[in-house]
């Protein structure tokens, strides 16, 4: 089941991008050298070869495997190639990042409004007859921010990727709008109530404050003090808002602690612990038993093919909440190798190129994006298309740096 791939707005934009490249550039430039400069040539080769092979195994009998092949080839591989054709300089990379960040501010504003009015305005944009993910989860009495992503955790993943980029723009272009965009994305991420993402962002914030240059550190601490003052004032003026934020923080502490305490009117999944994510690791054992090399196939959890070991008994479950488990159970060892090959190389490469004492080095934000994504994947089963845009921009940014250095 699953049918043909949906004609989504992102796919229409990709089609437009392809047409622009064909008519403007007249030819496709090879990106082998830029990939080698960043050390991503072989990791990306392994990633795409392994995933295409794993899904190709099921393609003759499983339409969702064809959909996944389409996503991997067109929305990941082809997307990187197309962006590297269009974005030809560091100035172009900066403009792309600024545009992405500015757009995220608009999305964050509407998402926060959705929380305030208790309804998702983005649902009015749904024009397809097929069922699409629109969760509209209510937790602790308020709707969770989710924007157009269908689920709060997916929007939280988007915020986790956007915030490091917004931080870069805020550092290098000091104006009120950039400060607002950064703040809006932080608030939106908090209002998703995705506890794993909130903890990751808090950890990254603390690390960044420690390793950043003195000037940046002072600016951040000043901003934090200002936000704290506003929060105190709001808590006195509107006690219900203060209680809501307090409950979110409390739910995060309970989720990552050993407390058996619960939150009244929590809603959705359990407010106590993240044991379900740990239990899902047993799905890898189930995969190894049944098809170690190719896995159980795309969307195995919705087809009743996936089981987790719960209280010593294998039980069929229809959810995957851990991104790494998703790679393994759906695509076997091939998918697992593809995943870890790519993520390890992204972290290693970007860490080598980052210089946190120089705030103008965009590799700092790229590194934080990759760390954020890798960490959030522990609690979110999502392959964000924004990640591939960031990877393409990272490749172009450093390829141009190498070209400038060699002149």
List each language-model region with its residue ranges.
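Interfacial loop-to-transmembrane-helix boundary motif in multi-pass membrane proteins
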Residues: 36-47, 74, 82-120
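Hydrophobic transmembrane alpha-helices and their immediate junctions
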Residues: 172-179, 202-211, 308-311, 330-372
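Transmembrane alpha-helices of multi-pass inner-membrane enzymes
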Residues: 205-206, 222, 342-345, 362-407
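Alpha-helical transmembrane segments of multi-pass inner-membrane proteins
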Residues: 52, 95-127, 137-141, 147-212, ...
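Long extracytoplasmic/lumenal interhelical loops at the membrane interface
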Residues: 139, 260-331
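A membrane-periplasm/extracellular boundary helix in multi-pass inner-membrane enzymes
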Residues: 109, 115-118, 192, 212-267, ...
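Hydrophobic core segments of transmembrane alpha-helices in multi-pass, intramembrane catalytic enzymes
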Residues: 8-18, 67-80, 153-169, 196-208, ...
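N-terminal hydrophobic segments of proteins, predominantly signal-anchor/transmembrane helices
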Residues: 1, 9-78, 370-373
């Amino acid at each position: 089941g699953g049918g043909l791939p949906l004609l989504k707005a992102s796919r229409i934009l990709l089609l437009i991008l392809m047409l622009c490249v064909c008519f403007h550039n007249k030819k496709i430039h090879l990106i082998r050298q830029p990939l080698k400069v960043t050390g991503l040539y072989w990791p990306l080769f392994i990633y795409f070869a392994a995933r295409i092979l794993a899904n190709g195994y099921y393609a003759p009998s499983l339409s969702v495997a064809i959909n996944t092949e389409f996503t991997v080839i067109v929305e990941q591989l082809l997307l990187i190639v197309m962006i590297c054709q269009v974005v030809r300089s560091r100035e172009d990379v900066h403009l792309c990042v600024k545009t992405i960040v500015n757009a995220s501010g608009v999305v964050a504003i509407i998402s926060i409004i959705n929380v305030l009015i208790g309804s998702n305005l983005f649902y009015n944009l749904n024009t397809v007859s097929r069922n699409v993910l629109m969760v509209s989860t209510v937790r602790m009495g308020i709707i969770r921010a989710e924007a157009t992503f269908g689920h709060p955790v997916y929007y939280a993943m988007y915020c986790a990727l956007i915030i490091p980029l917004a931080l870069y723009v805020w550092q290098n272009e000091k104006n009120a709008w950039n400060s607002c965009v950064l703040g809006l994305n932080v608030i939106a991420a908090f209002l998703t109530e995705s506890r794993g993402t909130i903890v990751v962002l808090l950890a990254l914030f603390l690390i960044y404050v420690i390793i950043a240059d003195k000037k940046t550190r002072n600016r951040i601490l000043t901003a934090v003090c200002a936000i704290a003052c506003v929060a105190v004032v709001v808590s006195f003026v509107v006690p219900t808002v203060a209680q809501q934020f307090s409950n979110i923080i409390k739910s995060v502490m309970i989720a990552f602690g050993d407390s058996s305490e619960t939150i009244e009117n929590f809603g959705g999944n359990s407010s106590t612990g993240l044991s379900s994510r740990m239990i899902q690791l047993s799905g890898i054992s189930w995969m190894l038993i049944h098809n170690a090399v190719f896995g159980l196939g795309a969307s195995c959890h919705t087809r009743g093919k996936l089981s987790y070991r719960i209280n010593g008994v294998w039980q069929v479950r229809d959810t995957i909440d851990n991104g790494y488990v998703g790679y393994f159970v759906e695509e076997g060892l091939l998918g697992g190798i593809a995943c870890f090959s790519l993520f390890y190389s992204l972290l290693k490469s970007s860490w080598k190129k980052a210089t946190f004492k120089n705030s103008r080095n965009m590799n700092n934000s790229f590194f934080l994006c990759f760390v954020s994504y890798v960490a959030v994947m522990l609690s979110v089963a999502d392959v964000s298309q924004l990640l591939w845009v960031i990877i393409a921009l990272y490749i172009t940014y450093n390829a141009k740096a190498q070209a400038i250095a060699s002149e």
